[in-house]
């Protein structure tokens, strides 16, 4: 039987400054995950060697995930019937992934320590005139490989201390353009995405 013993800790902090014509927001978050993955054999018929509840594998995963960010919204035009805003969102993200122990499928060692440094920016422009709203934005998003990506692809050679099959982080470029028309009786909108 495969089992987990997980613990997750974290915290979030943010501050906001509102003024005319610029709003600012700063913040960050940090999380720490501890995961023990293990398997036991509860009973094996005709086994003279293995005790009941024999633990046949165990591996430990540690993941640190921390980020800081800054956001700004600049109201270039701020009239009752016409508004134009420019915004930017900048995020730095750090991820550390540590793993050790034994693989549950082929009983090979799983030592691994990997660090990722990500910069995730987003910028956009919105224009509103009476019932019309036009918005455009560009963003870059990054994501680290999952535990399964490492478990299923990485091979560790204990004699050389080298790895093969290390997965890479994913990067997404997101372009968006949207239009909305609002009337007291109805609203209609369309969004275009390119990633």
Identify what each model region corresponds to:
Residues 5-9, 62-66, 115-119, 171-175, ...:
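Residues that define the transmembrane beta-barrel architecture of outer-membrane proteins
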Residues 1-104, 124-128, 189:
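Face-selective signature of the C-terminal outer-membrane beta-barrel domain
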